[in-house]
Amino acid sequence: MQKGIRLNDGHVASLGLLARKDGTRKGYLSKRSSDNTKWQTKWFALLQNLLFYFESDSSSRPSGLYLLEGCVCDRAPSPKPALSAKEPLEKQHYFTVNFSHENQKALELRTEDAKDCDEWVAAIAHASYRTLATEHEALMQKYLHLLQIVETEKTVAKQLRQQIEDGEIEIERLKAEITSLLKDNERIQSTQTVAPNDEDSDIKKIKKVQSFLRGWLCRRKWKTIIQDYIRSPHADSMRKRNQVVFSMLEAEAEYVQQLHILVNNFLRPLRMAASSKKPPITHDDVSSIFLNSETIMFLHQIFYQGLKARISSWPTLVLADLFDILLPMLNIYQEFVRNHQYSLQILAHCKQNRDFDKLLKHYEAKPDCEERTLETFLTYPMFQIPRYILTLHELLAHTPHEHVERNSLDYAKSKLEELSRIMHDEVSETENIRKNLAIERMIIEGCEILLDTSQTFVRQGSLIQVPMSEKGKITRGRLGSLSLKKEGERQCFLFSKHLIICTRGSGGKLHLTKNGVISLIDCTLLEEPESTEEEAKGSGQDIDHLDFKIGVEPKDSPPFTVILVASSRQEKAAWTSDISQCVDNIRCNGLMMNAFEENSKVTVPQMIKRTREGTREAEMSRSDASLYCDDVDIRFSKTMNSCKVLQIRYASVERLLERLTDLRFLSIDFLNTFLHSYRVFTTAIVVLDKLITIYKKPISAIPARWLRSLELLFASGQNNKLLYGEPPKSPRATRKFSSPPPLSITKTSSPSRRRKLSLNIPIITGGKALDLAALSCNSNGYTSMYSAMSPFSKATLDTSKLYVSSSFTNKIPDEGDTTPEKPEDPSALSKQSSEVSMREESDIDQNQSDDGDTETSPTKSPTTPKSVKNKNSSEFPLFSYNNGVVMTSCRELDNNRSALSAASAFAIATAGANEGTPNKEKYRRMSLASAGFPPDQRNGDKEFVIRRAATNRVLNVLRHWVSKHSQDFETNDELKCKVIGFLEEVMHDPELLTQERKAAANIIRTLTQEDPGDNQITLEEITQMAEGVKAEPFENHSALEIAEQLTLLDHLVFKKIPYEEFFGQGWMKLEKNERTPYIMKTTKHFNDISNLIASEIIRNEDINARVSAIEKWVAVADICRCLHNYNAVLEITSSMNRSAIFRLKKTWLKVSKQTKALIDKLQKLVSSEGRFKNLREALKNCDPPCVPYLGMYLTDLAFIEEGTPNYTEDGLVNFSKMRMISHIIREIRQFQQTAYKIEHQAKVTQYLLDQSFVMDEESLYESSLRIEPKLPT
């Protein structure tokens, strides 16, 4: 009997451990058992040609060993599945290992992954020792061959060295021989007689020619070497690096000058003023406004001197040590940054002092300031660190990786980027204050309401104001006329609380019009103003529904009405939607603030403030902490938005979508920023799906923390005095209304401070109005409500005249007055209600009899004509539902009077007309008025209110989206179809209110119809007309024609840029033509026009013709300046500064002094100095239409993008950055949306678009050298 082979068990175990650690292939495989019935999963490890398997990957001792030498490994086909097989064969991949021994059974293995199977087969196939030995042998043969080659080369090298040594010896011998020959030659020449003179002169000439040739050859060789280096990449990189440093020196000199003006013109004089007998400002305020300003000036003076010293040692420029000096002082900048917002707030507060404001204007009028304001100088340090980051980026781009300064510059950039992120947040948060102060400075009369730092700027633009008496006389043709444009054009500025209406005066300054400061809290917006039959006949279709009306009821002056006309339907929709949203924000703030103060002792917006005195802990515990407390997925800034809620600094996409659909408030500034920037962090479909979810499942879709806040609206069970206040002691005069009137509830204890809370009461059914104060709170609530409602089928109700008793109206602590007890008989209330109804009907009839009267009392509202009922409107505010017309109206709430409870107000605001609604549903909607109903009934009312609010929110967001961002739907058919489908589904909802259905229909109409207001020719049509047509020469067109058509072309190119291209710096990326095609087209158009102007000047051979061309183009530039086409001004001035034109000294000597002075004026206007400060001032002082220089905005966007990523390290969206970019886009779109009224002239545009004679840069310079050659030096 043959004995088994003995193996060293310990050695095998150690090899197994080595395989576990360093094996070439490891993992789980399924192995077929010896009886071919089962598959066992083992952990295999391959080490060279040894295959170990273990019970698991944690086993320390191998279960078996296979010697793979001489084996063959191949993939095996999958076997036919058995009927009882449970595992799917498509996830099993087989391979076999066949051994060379005939009686040895093949090893069958399988894996679940095809890739894993192939890798195992390849690893086993290469595990043979024989293969390794063969490869080793081949390598040894190659090694021996290379050794032979090396030996041969060594022999050859030795021979060459020997030849070189022999050559050197021969050279030395020849040198000695030459020396001896020269000595012999000198000796012979000294003994010989002197040669004839003519022979000497010939030799001298030959020598001179030889010397000249030698010098010429040397100079030519040297010139070639220099030119080769100049054209080399290294020299180009060094030139660019030096250019960056020189630009940095100029920028630093300008910045030091700005700091010098800030300190010497403002800080030091104000310190002296604070020490006077009657100081206009205190030393503490001076320190708060100018914190660290003087220290920063000293720091940069040192930095600037060091930079100048480095420049003096050019071309060796070492800059890293300069930044090493700057970096330790960054804490000074950090203190300045953190104080920046507080600084501007203190400045705004101090400007309310007339003496200080007068003194400050005196300082700002100094020539050094160049009409720049103090807040502008205070903002300059905020932009310096981003400028350093851009400079370091450019320096690093042109600094080799092995450069000694590379690491130091990288470190400086990283440190500055950390500070830059903080600065961007601070600049974003203070931008609103700076914008308000800038507008206030533009108004000659001043505007104190803009010094309120809580005001949020929303939009600005040009509108035409139409007097009421001329409403029917204005026609579309006259709207475009110069006479009405002069008389009626207004510059309108919308803020979160006010609308400012101004006229433009000389020098770009603004003048407030009469009643030009409109408080939105007193406003009623009517989008489709009513018109009588005579007015309709007079106006016809000319005005084309571009006008809207704002009714204003100030508390201390007579009411008045403002009619404004937009230039297009899109502009009108943007204005009305923003005004409506601002009014809704004020109304929501007022209602909720009053409700929370009376209901839960928590005040909105104080419920989200962390500094409220006395009730801080109670507020934080009882309100929604997610509105002000930072969390892992959201972080807040210090400033508040228009809804008095902390602005979001960073947030996740989900939290941003939550804020968009938060039913408690919707800030207009958040909404505009979100709609501008959502493409950066999400898609339109995701946003739409979120809105659809909120509409379909409002209760389950909103977070639980919202419900806790919303439930405070329904906590009226213990404070019914809010609903049933004391009766007024004197009845108020009634007013006539053809639509439902405002609900006025007043407190009679302080009649001198009485204000009205106007809410539009919805029509429940058949024109009946509901008065919540007339409803009973007992168990027979339905009966009493029905009896109270029945008389009002044709009448409307003013609750300020009602005297309602209730068992729940107790003594109000802060007034001390008592109310009568409620009658026990339920019929008493019905009787009382009927008496009230009769009084109301008599009053209404009396008012209807004097229909032509006009009410002008400060306590009364403007009459709403009957014709309003038949108007359709796209307006859909949060709390306003009238039958047939939508009006936004609100009043400031007074803390000293009783007010409507939040539950009642919310019910009134969200109920509406719905014909055919069952009585039970009507009563259920009104049950919020009674705290005596069961809890399940109140829960049902709460759900109804939330559903109405959710529907309102969805339609409101869609309205803003469709009216302001129509291009989203023009370029995305899927989104457009999905929105239309959703709105059609909404319209078929049987529970939808009439006004909600109208709002949905208006959005669909806006999506499907084209705006007929813009009939301007398109750029494509102009380009198509210019193709294949020979253009007339430059001399055939006047300067005015060229300027007008150039302005038309520039604006058509500029207005085509979609705002999504301004995100992400796509114009600086490699794929810029794909990411930002319209920005690149604008850049190409700018360069084409500049090349055209330069080519037109250069191609004139005659010097007088060139002078004439220059003067004509300068005249074109000046006309473009008058047309506010600053892009064309820069196109023309940049072409004049090109080297091919600038070097024409003879030509420029013949150009007149007036033309040269005009060129200097235009160049100063569009100069990039001070971040285009002169151009920005010109844009601020001009009215659209206008074509700004796009590069200015791209520079601003680059400053924002550099060092501030779109996402934080935690993956949160940088919403502060989105807000800053959105504000820049808002300004760009203001200029894009206002078109020029210039008639197209095909012959001129054909010349401007003709590229047949345009030369490139090199050809231009060659032609310039040909017409005026270089003068010899």
Swiss-Prot record:
<dbReference type="GO" id="GO:0044342">
    <property type="term" value="P:type B pancreatic cell proliferation"/>
</dbReference>
<dbReference type="GO" id="GO:0005886">
    <property type="term" value="C:plasma membrane"/>
</dbReference>
<dbReference type="GO" id="GO:0043409">
    <property type="term" value="P:negative regulation of MAPK cascade"/>
</dbReference>
<dbReference type="InterPro" id="IPR011993">
    <property type="entry name" value="PH-like_dom_sf"/>
</dbReference>
<dbReference type="InterPro" id="IPR023578">
    <property type="entry name" value="Ras_GEF_dom_sf"/>
</dbReference>
<feature type="compositionally biased region" description="Acidic residues">
    <location>
        <begin position="842"/>
        <end position="854"/>
    </location>
</feature>
<dbReference type="GO" id="GO:0043005">
    <property type="term" value="C:neuron projection"/>
</dbReference>
<feature type="region of interest" description="Disordered">
    <location>
        <begin position="809"/>
        <end position="874"/>
    </location>
</feature>
<dbReference type="GO" id="GO:0035022">
    <property type="term" value="P:positive regulation of Rac protein signal transduction"/>
</dbReference>
<dbReference type="GO" id="GO:0048167">
    <property type="term" value="P:regulation of synaptic plasticity"/>
</dbReference>
<keyword id="KW-0597">Phosphoprotein</keyword>
<protein>
    <recommendedName>
        <fullName>Ras-specific guanine nucleotide-releasing factor 1</fullName>
    </recommendedName>
</protein>
<dbReference type="Pfam" id="PF00169">
    <property type="entry name" value="PH"/>
</dbReference>
<dbReference type="GO" id="GO:0007165">
    <property type="term" value="P:signal transduction"/>
</dbReference>
<dbReference type="GO" id="GO:0031175">
    <property type="term" value="P:neuron projection development"/>
</dbReference>
<comment type="subunit">
    <text>Homooligomer and heterooligomer with RASGRF2. Interacts with USP8, thereby regulating its stability.</text>
</comment>
<dbReference type="GO" id="GO:0046579">
    <property type="term" value="P:positive regulation of Ras protein signal transduction"/>
</dbReference>
<dbReference type="InterPro" id="IPR001331">
    <property type="entry name" value="GDS_CDC24_CS"/>
</dbReference>
<comment type="function">
    <text>Promotes the exchange of Ras-bound GDP by GTP.</text>
</comment>
<feature type="region of interest" description="Disordered">
    <location>
        <begin position="724"/>
        <end position="754"/>
    </location>
</feature>
<feature type="domain" description="PH 1">
    <location>
        <begin position="22"/>
        <end position="129"/>
    </location>
</feature>
<feature type="compositionally biased region" description="Low complexity">
    <location>
        <begin position="855"/>
        <end position="867"/>
    </location>
</feature>
<feature type="modified residue" description="Phosphoserine">
    <location>
        <position position="758"/>
    </location>
</feature>
<dbReference type="InterPro" id="IPR000219">
    <property type="entry name" value="DH_dom"/>
</dbReference>
<keyword id="KW-0677">Repeat</keyword>
<keyword id="KW-0344">Guanine-nucleotide releasing factor</keyword>
<dbReference type="GO" id="GO:0035254">
    <property type="term" value="F:glutamate receptor binding"/>
</dbReference>
<dbReference type="GO" id="GO:0030426">
    <property type="term" value="C:growth cone"/>
</dbReference>
<dbReference type="GO" id="GO:0005829">
    <property type="term" value="C:cytosol"/>
</dbReference>
<dbReference type="GO" id="GO:0034976">
    <property type="term" value="P:response to endoplasmic reticulum stress"/>
</dbReference>
<feature type="domain" description="Ras-GEF">
    <location>
        <begin position="1038"/>
        <end position="1270"/>
    </location>
</feature>
<keyword id="KW-0832">Ubl conjugation</keyword>
<dbReference type="GO" id="GO:0046578">
    <property type="term" value="P:regulation of Ras protein signal transduction"/>
</dbReference>
<dbReference type="InterPro" id="IPR000651">
    <property type="entry name" value="Ras-like_Gua-exchang_fac_N"/>
</dbReference>
<dbReference type="GO" id="GO:0007265">
    <property type="term" value="P:Ras protein signal transduction"/>
</dbReference>
<dbReference type="Pfam" id="PF00621">
    <property type="entry name" value="RhoGEF"/>
</dbReference>
<feature type="modified residue" description="Phosphoserine; by PLK2">
    <location>
        <position position="626"/>
    </location>
</feature>
<dbReference type="GO" id="GO:0007616">
    <property type="term" value="P:long-term memory"/>
</dbReference>
<dbReference type="InterPro" id="IPR001895">
    <property type="entry name" value="RASGEF_cat_dom"/>
</dbReference>
<feature type="domain" description="DH">
    <location>
        <begin position="240"/>
        <end position="426"/>
    </location>
</feature>
<dbReference type="GO" id="GO:0005085">
    <property type="term" value="F:guanyl-nucleotide exchange factor activity"/>
</dbReference>
<dbReference type="InterPro" id="IPR001849">
    <property type="entry name" value="PH_domain"/>
</dbReference>
